[in-house]
Protein backbone atom coordinates (compact mmCIF):
# COMPACT_ATOMS: atom_id res chain seq x y z
CA UNK A 1 0.00 0.00 0.00
CA UNK A 2 2.89 2.35 0.85
CA UNK A 3 4.49 1.50 -2.52
CA UNK A 4 1.24 2.33 -4.38
CA UNK A 5 0.88 5.68 -2.59
CA UNK A 6 4.49 6.54 -3.39
CA UNK A 7 3.99 5.78 -7.09
CA UNK A 8 0.75 7.75 -7.26
CA UNK A 9 2.50 10.74 -5.68
CA UNK A 10 5.32 10.46 -8.24
CA UNK A 11 2.79 10.37 -11.04
CA UNK A 12 0.96 13.47 -9.84
CA UNK A 13 4.26 15.35 -9.48
CA UNK A 14 5.16 14.39 -13.06
CA UNK A 15 1.78 15.68 -14.25
CA UNK A 16 2.30 19.00 -12.49
CA UNK A 17 5.80 19.31 -13.97
CA UNK A 18 4.33 18.62 -17.41
CA UNK A 19 1.68 21.30 -16.88
CA UNK A 20 4.37 23.84 -16.00
CA UNK A 21 6.40 22.84 -19.08
CA UNK A 22 3.39 23.32 -21.29
CA UNK A 23 2.75 26.77 -19.89
CA UNK A 24 -0.57 27.97 -18.61
CA UNK A 25 -1.41 30.95 -20.75
CA UNK A 26 -5.06 30.83 -21.86
CA UNK A 27 -7.30 30.03 -24.92
CA UNK A 28 -9.67 27.60 -26.58
CA UNK A 29 -11.31 26.77 -29.99
CA UNK A 30 -14.96 25.83 -30.38
CA UNK A 31 -17.15 24.39 -33.05
CA UNK A 32 -16.72 25.15 -36.75
CA UNK A 33 -17.80 28.39 -38.38
CA UNK A 34 -20.34 29.15 -41.06
CA UNK A 35 -19.52 31.37 -44.06
CA UNK A 36 -21.36 34.38 -42.63
CA UNK A 37 -19.60 34.12 -39.29
CA UNK A 38 -16.19 33.58 -40.92
CA UNK A 39 -16.71 36.74 -42.96
CA UNK A 40 -17.23 38.76 -39.79
CA UNK A 41 -13.89 37.55 -38.44
CA UNK A 42 -11.56 38.72 -41.16
CA UNK A 43 -12.11 40.53 -44.44
CA UNK A 44 -9.52 38.27 -46.06
CA UNK A 45 -11.71 35.24 -45.35
CA UNK A 46 -14.95 36.47 -46.96
CA UNK A 47 -14.88 33.88 -49.73
CA UNK A 48 -14.16 30.95 -47.45
CA UNK A 49 -16.69 28.48 -46.14
CA UNK A 50 -15.67 26.59 -43.04
CA UNK A 51 -17.54 23.37 -42.35
CA UNK A 52 -16.87 20.90 -39.57
CA UNK A 53 -19.82 18.78 -38.58
CA UNK A 54 -20.39 16.42 -35.71
CA UNK A 55 -17.99 13.58 -35.09
CA UNK A 56 -19.74 10.22 -34.93
CA UNK A 57 -18.42 7.95 -32.15
CA UNK A 58 -14.83 9.13 -31.69
CA UNK A 59 -12.81 11.94 -30.10
CA UNK A 60 -9.23 11.23 -31.08
CA UNK A 61 -8.75 13.20 -34.29
CA UNK A 62 -9.90 16.48 -35.82
CA UNK A 63 -10.95 17.70 -39.28
CA UNK A 64 -12.44 20.78 -40.88
CA UNK A 65 -13.29 21.68 -44.49
CA UNK A 66 -12.33 25.12 -45.81
CA UNK A 67 -13.47 25.49 -49.41
CA UNK A 68 -11.63 22.77 -51.35
CA UNK A 69 -9.16 22.08 -48.55
CA UNK A 70 -9.46 19.52 -45.76
CA UNK A 71 -7.42 20.31 -42.63
CA UNK A 72 -7.01 17.34 -40.31
CA UNK A 73 -4.91 16.13 -37.39
CA UNK A 74 -4.02 12.63 -36.21
CA UNK A 75 -4.17 11.43 -32.63
CA UNK A 76 -0.94 10.44 -30.87
CA UNK A 77 1.38 11.50 -33.71
CA UNK A 78 0.62 15.22 -33.33
CA UNK A 79 0.78 15.93 -37.08
CA UNK A 80 -1.50 18.45 -38.81
CA UNK A 81 -2.13 18.08 -42.56
CA UNK A 82 -3.89 19.87 -45.40
CA UNK A 83 -5.39 17.93 -48.30
CA UNK A 84 -6.33 19.95 -51.40
CA UNK A 85 -9.25 18.13 -53.06
CA UNK A 86 -8.84 19.88 -56.43
CA UNK A 87 -5.05 19.63 -56.69
CA UNK A 88 -5.02 16.20 -54.96
CA UNK A 89 -2.05 17.22 -52.83
CA UNK A 90 -1.51 16.19 -49.22
CA UNK A 91 0.80 18.50 -47.25
CA UNK A 92 2.11 18.12 -43.71
CA UNK A 93 1.73 21.54 -42.07
CA UNK A 94 3.10 21.08 -38.57
CA UNK A 95 3.95 18.81 -35.69
CA UNK A 96 2.92 19.71 -32.18
CA UNK A 97 5.44 20.21 -29.37
CA UNK A 98 6.66 16.94 -27.85
CA UNK A 99 4.95 17.61 -24.52
CA UNK A 100 1.46 17.61 -26.07
CA UNK A 101 1.70 14.58 -28.33
CA UNK A 102 2.30 11.68 -25.97
CA UNK A 103 0.23 8.49 -26.08
CA UNK A 104 -2.53 9.96 -23.88
CA UNK A 105 -3.20 13.01 -26.05
CA UNK A 106 -6.25 13.41 -28.22
CA UNK A 107 -7.76 16.31 -30.11
CA UNK A 108 -11.33 17.53 -30.23
CA UNK A 109 -13.30 17.97 -33.46
CA UNK A 110 -14.10 21.52 -32.37
CA UNK A 111 -11.77 23.60 -34.47
CA UNK A 112 -11.44 26.56 -36.80
CA UNK A 113 -9.30 26.93 -39.88
CA UNK A 114 -8.31 29.74 -42.23
CA UNK A 115 -9.07 32.58 -39.88
CA UNK A 116 -6.25 34.88 -40.95
CA UNK A 117 -4.48 31.72 -42.19
CA UNK A 118 -4.57 30.11 -38.75
CA UNK A 119 -5.86 26.73 -37.63
CA UNK A 120 -7.25 26.66 -34.09
CA UNK A 121 -8.22 23.51 -32.24
CA UNK A 122 -8.37 22.19 -28.72
CA UNK A 123 -6.51 19.22 -27.35
CA UNK A 124 -6.73 17.18 -24.16
CA UNK A 125 -3.94 15.47 -22.26
CA UNK A 126 -4.86 12.86 -19.67
CA UNK A 127 -2.13 12.39 -17.11
CA UNK A 128 -2.09 9.84 -14.32
CA UNK A 129 -4.44 7.10 -13.23
CA UNK A 130 -8.06 7.54 -12.16
CA UNK A 131 -7.08 10.28 -9.74
CA UNK A 132 -4.70 12.00 -12.17
CA UNK A 133 -4.91 15.36 -13.87
CA UNK A 134 -6.63 16.28 -17.11
CA UNK A 135 -4.98 19.11 -19.02
CA UNK A 136 -6.57 20.90 -21.94
CA UNK A 137 -5.88 23.89 -24.10
CA UNK A 138 -6.05 25.66 -27.44
CA UNK A 139 -3.31 25.27 -29.99
CA UNK A 140 -2.90 27.69 -32.90
CA UNK A 141 -1.07 26.64 -36.07
CA UNK A 142 -0.04 28.96 -38.89
CA UNK A 143 -1.10 27.05 -42.01
CA UNK A 144 1.53 28.84 -44.12
CA UNK A 145 4.70 28.24 -42.11
CA UNK A 146 3.61 25.53 -39.66
CA UNK A 147 4.50 27.53 -36.54
CA UNK A 148 2.68 26.30 -33.43
CA UNK A 149 1.65 28.41 -30.45
CA UNK A 150 -0.10 27.35 -27.23
CA UNK A 151 -2.66 30.06 -26.51
CA UNK A 152 -4.17 28.56 -23.38
CA UNK A 153 -3.43 25.57 -21.18
CA UNK A 154 -5.16 24.53 -17.97
CA UNK A 155 -5.08 21.45 -15.74
CA UNK A 156 -7.75 20.06 -13.40
CA UNK A 157 -8.24 16.86 -11.49
CA UNK A 158 -10.08 14.15 -13.41
CA UNK A 159 -10.89 12.23 -10.22
CA UNK A 160 -14.08 14.15 -9.44
CA UNK A 161 -17.38 14.39 -11.29
CA UNK A 162 -18.31 16.02 -13.53
CA UNK A 163 -15.19 15.96 -15.67
CA UNK A 164 -13.52 19.34 -16.24
CA UNK A 165 -15.19 21.35 -19.00
CA UNK A 166 -13.57 23.39 -21.74
CA UNK A 167 -15.36 25.16 -24.62
CA UNK A 168 -14.62 28.13 -26.89
CA UNK A 169 -15.87 30.25 -29.78
CA UNK A 170 -14.28 32.70 -32.19
CA UNK A 171 -16.37 35.78 -32.90
CA UNK A 172 -15.44 39.21 -34.28
CA UNK A 173 -11.69 38.75 -33.89
CA UNK A 174 -12.02 37.57 -30.29
CA UNK A 175 -11.87 34.15 -28.69
CA UNK A 176 -14.50 33.56 -26.02
CA UNK A 177 -13.88 30.51 -23.86
CA UNK A 178 -15.24 28.79 -20.76
CA UNK A 179 -13.45 26.27 -18.58
CA UNK A 180 -13.45 24.66 -15.16
CA UNK A 181 -10.56 24.57 -12.75
CA UNK A 182 -10.10 22.74 -9.47
CA UNK A 183 -9.46 19.46 -7.72
CA UNK A 184 -12.57 18.76 -5.64
CA UNK A 185 -14.97 21.67 -6.08
CA UNK A 186 -14.69 23.29 -9.48
CA UNK A 187 -14.70 26.99 -10.20
CA UNK A 188 -15.94 27.92 -13.67
CA UNK A 189 -14.60 30.80 -15.76
CA UNK A 190 -15.91 32.61 -18.83
CA UNK A 191 -13.18 34.72 -20.46
CA UNK A 192 -12.04 36.36 -23.68
CA UNK A 193 -8.79 37.05 -25.52
CA UNK A 194 -7.43 38.20 -28.84
CA UNK A 195 -6.76 35.70 -31.64
CA UNK A 196 -3.05 35.69 -30.78
CA UNK A 197 -3.74 34.90 -27.12
CA UNK A 198 -3.11 38.42 -25.80
CA UNK A 199 -5.37 40.57 -23.59
CA UNK A 200 -6.95 37.74 -21.63
CA UNK A 201 -9.89 38.90 -19.55
CA UNK A 202 -12.16 36.99 -17.14
CA UNK A 203 -15.76 38.03 -17.86
CA UNK A 204 -17.57 35.93 -15.26
CA UNK A 205 -16.43 33.61 -12.51
CA UNK A 206 -18.86 33.84 -9.59
CA UNK A 207 -22.06 33.82 -11.67
CA UNK A 208 -20.95 30.97 -13.94
CA UNK A 209 -19.67 28.89 -11.01
CA UNK A 210 -22.94 29.33 -9.14
CA UNK A 211 -25.03 28.28 -12.15
CA UNK A 212 -22.87 25.25 -12.98
CA UNK A 213 -22.86 24.03 -9.38
CA UNK A 214 -26.62 24.44 -9.00
CA UNK A 215 -27.65 22.86 -12.32
CA UNK A 216 -27.38 19.09 -12.02
CA UNK A 217 -25.46 17.42 -14.89
CA UNK A 218 -24.71 20.87 -16.32
CA UNK A 219 -22.91 21.36 -19.62
CA UNK A 220 -21.56 24.44 -21.36
CA UNK A 221 -21.69 25.77 -24.92
CA UNK A 222 -19.84 28.91 -25.98
CA UNK A 223 -21.66 30.55 -28.88
CA UNK A 224 -20.39 33.83 -30.33
CA UNK A 225 -19.76 36.11 -27.33
CA UNK A 226 -21.82 34.26 -24.69
CA UNK A 227 -21.70 31.05 -22.67
CA UNK A 228 -24.78 28.85 -22.28
CA UNK A 229 -25.27 26.40 -19.40
CA UNK A 230 -27.79 23.59 -19.79
CA UNK A 231 -28.68 20.02 -18.83
CA UNK A 232 -30.82 17.35 -20.43
CA UNK A 233 -34.02 18.74 -18.95
CA UNK A 234 -35.28 22.32 -18.88
CA UNK A 235 -32.62 24.51 -17.24
CA UNK A 236 -30.89 26.89 -19.61
CA UNK A 237 -28.85 29.97 -18.67
CA UNK A 238 -26.95 32.52 -20.72
CA UNK A 239 -24.09 34.75 -19.55
CA UNK A 240 -23.11 37.43 -22.07
CA UNK A 241 -19.81 39.25 -22.66
CA UNK A 242 -20.72 41.78 -19.95
CA UNK A 243 -21.25 39.04 -17.38
CA UNK A 244 -25.04 39.45 -17.26
CA UNK A 245 -26.93 36.24 -16.46
CA UNK A 246 -30.40 35.45 -17.85
CA UNK A 247 -32.56 32.33 -17.69
CA UNK A 248 -33.89 31.19 -21.06
CA UNK A 249 -37.16 29.42 -21.64
CA UNK A 250 -37.96 27.26 -24.66
CA UNK A 251 -34.82 25.17 -24.26
CA UNK A 252 -35.18 22.92 -27.36
CA UNK A 253 -35.57 25.82 -29.84
CA UNK A 254 -32.72 27.92 -28.42
CA UNK A 255 -30.42 24.93 -27.95
CA UNK A 256 -30.91 23.76 -31.54
CA UNK A 257 -30.32 27.28 -32.88
CA UNK A 258 -27.02 27.51 -31.02
CA UNK A 259 -25.85 24.07 -32.13
CA UNK A 260 -26.69 24.74 -35.79
CA UNK A 261 -24.91 28.10 -35.74
CA UNK A 262 -21.75 26.75 -34.14
CA UNK A 263 -21.36 23.58 -36.17
CA UNK A 264 -22.88 24.10 -39.60
CA UNK A 265 -24.85 20.92 -38.93
CA UNK A 266 -27.80 19.99 -36.77
CA UNK A 267 -26.44 17.85 -33.96
CA UNK A 268 -28.69 15.37 -32.18
CA UNK A 269 -26.88 12.87 -30.00
CA UNK A 270 -24.82 10.75 -32.36
CA UNK A 271 -26.44 12.15 -35.51
CA UNK A 272 -25.55 14.98 -37.91
CA UNK A 273 -27.79 16.64 -40.50
CA UNK A 274 -26.46 18.41 -43.57
CA UNK A 275 -28.28 19.66 -46.71
CA UNK A 276 -31.40 17.56 -46.17
CA UNK A 277 -29.63 14.37 -45.13
CA UNK A 278 -29.15 12.80 -41.71
CA UNK A 279 -26.00 10.82 -40.96
CA UNK A 280 -25.96 8.28 -38.16
CA UNK A 281 -23.10 6.00 -37.10
CA UNK A 282 -24.43 2.84 -35.49
CA UNK A 283 -22.83 -0.14 -33.81
CA UNK A 284 -19.41 -0.69 -32.24
CA UNK A 285 -17.83 -1.22 -35.68
CA UNK A 286 -19.15 2.03 -37.16
CA UNK A 287 -21.98 1.54 -39.61
CA UNK A 288 -22.58 4.88 -41.40
CA UNK A 289 -26.23 5.37 -42.34
CA UNK A 290 -27.47 8.20 -44.62
CA UNK A 291 -31.15 9.19 -44.58
CA UNK A 292 -33.07 11.53 -46.89
CA UNK A 293 -35.06 13.60 -44.39
CA UNK A 294 -37.75 14.59 -46.91
CA UNK A 295 -38.51 11.09 -48.25
CA UNK A 296 -37.43 8.98 -45.29
CA UNK A 297 -35.31 6.80 -47.58
CA UNK A 298 -32.17 5.55 -45.86
CA UNK A 299 -29.13 3.56 -46.84
CA UNK A 300 -25.95 2.22 -45.23
CA UNK A 301 -23.15 3.95 -47.15
CA UNK A 302 -20.09 2.69 -45.26
CA UNK A 303 -19.43 -0.18 -42.86
CA UNK A 304 -17.02 -2.91 -41.78
CA UNK A 305 -17.26 -6.18 -39.88
CA UNK A 306 -13.54 -6.46 -39.17
CA UNK A 307 -12.42 -3.03 -37.93
CA UNK A 308 -13.65 -0.18 -35.79
CA UNK A 309 -14.73 2.90 -37.71
CA UNK A 310 -15.69 6.46 -36.82
CA UNK A 311 -16.57 9.42 -39.00
CA UNK A 312 -16.50 13.20 -39.23
CA UNK A 313 -19.19 14.54 -41.57
CA UNK A 314 -17.67 17.57 -43.31
CA UNK A 315 -20.46 18.33 -45.76
CA UNK A 316 -19.40 17.31 -49.27
CA UNK A 317 -16.82 14.97 -47.75
CA UNK A 318 -16.51 12.56 -44.84
CA UNK A 319 -13.32 11.74 -42.94
CA UNK A 320 -13.19 8.09 -41.90
CA UNK A 321 -10.91 6.78 -39.14
CA UNK A 322 -10.28 3.03 -39.41
CA UNK A 323 -8.82 1.05 -36.51
CA UNK A 324 -7.69 -2.41 -37.66
CA UNK A 325 -6.31 -4.83 -35.07
CA UNK A 326 -3.04 -6.62 -35.74
CA UNK A 327 -2.12 -10.16 -34.71
CA UNK A 328 -0.41 -9.06 -31.50
CA UNK A 329 -2.84 -8.03 -28.76
CA UNK A 330 -2.96 -4.24 -28.24
CA UNK A 331 -1.43 -3.36 -31.60
CA UNK A 332 -3.39 -1.87 -34.49
CA UNK A 333 -3.12 0.19 -37.65
CA UNK A 334 -4.95 3.54 -37.87
CA UNK A 335 -5.91 4.88 -41.30
CA UNK A 336 -7.49 8.26 -42.04
CA UNK A 337 -9.45 8.01 -45.28
CA UNK A 338 -11.37 10.65 -47.24
CA UNK A 339 -14.83 9.64 -48.54
CA UNK A 340 -17.34 11.45 -50.71
CA UNK A 341 -20.82 12.13 -49.30
CA UNK A 342 -22.00 8.79 -50.71
CA UNK A 343 -19.51 6.94 -48.53
CA UNK A 344 -17.15 5.99 -51.38
CA UNK A 345 -13.38 6.15 -50.91
CA UNK A 346 -11.52 9.07 -52.50
CA UNK A 347 -8.09 8.62 -50.96
CA UNK A 348 -6.16 7.18 -48.01
CA UNK A 349 -4.75 10.34 -46.44
CA UNK A 350 -2.54 9.02 -43.64
CA UNK A 351 -1.87 5.79 -41.74
CA UNK A 352 0.22 4.87 -38.71
CA UNK A 353 0.68 2.06 -36.19
CA UNK A 354 -0.36 2.24 -32.55
CA UNK A 355 0.65 0.02 -29.63
CA UNK A 356 -1.83 0.41 -26.77
CA UNK A 357 0.42 -1.70 -24.51
CA UNK A 358 3.01 1.08 -24.28
Predicted feature residues:
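Sec-dependent signal peptide cleavage junction
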Residues: 24-42
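Short glycine/acidic-enriched loop and turn motifs that connect beta-strands
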Residues: 76-79, 130-135, 181-185, 234, ...
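Residue position within the beta-strands of beta-propeller blades
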Residues: 72-73, 126-128, 176-178, 229-230, ...
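Surface-exposed loop/turn elements that mediate protein-protein interactions on large endomembrane-trafficking
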Residues: 39-54, 80-101, 136-154, 188-205, ...
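Short, Lys/Arg-enriched N-terminal segments with co-localized hydrophobic residues
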Residues: 1-4
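Beta-strand-rich domains and repeat architectures in extracellular enzymes and scaffolds
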Residues: 48-78, 116
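Hydrophobic helical h-region of N-terminal Sec-dependent signal peptides
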Residues: 14-27
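Repeated scaffold domains used in trafficking and secretory/extracellular systems
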Residues: 57-64, 108-119, 158-171, 209-224, ...
Amino acid sequence: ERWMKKNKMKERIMCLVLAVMLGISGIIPTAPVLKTEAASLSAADDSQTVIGCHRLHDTSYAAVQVGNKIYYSSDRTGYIFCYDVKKKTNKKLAKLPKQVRNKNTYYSYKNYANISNMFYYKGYLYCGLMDGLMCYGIIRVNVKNGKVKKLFFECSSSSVLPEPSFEFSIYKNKIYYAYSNGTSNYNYYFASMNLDGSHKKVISQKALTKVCRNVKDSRMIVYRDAVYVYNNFDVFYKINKKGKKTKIKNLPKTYMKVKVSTSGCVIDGEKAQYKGYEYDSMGSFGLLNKKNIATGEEKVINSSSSERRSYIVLGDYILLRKNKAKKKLGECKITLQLLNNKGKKIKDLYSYNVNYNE
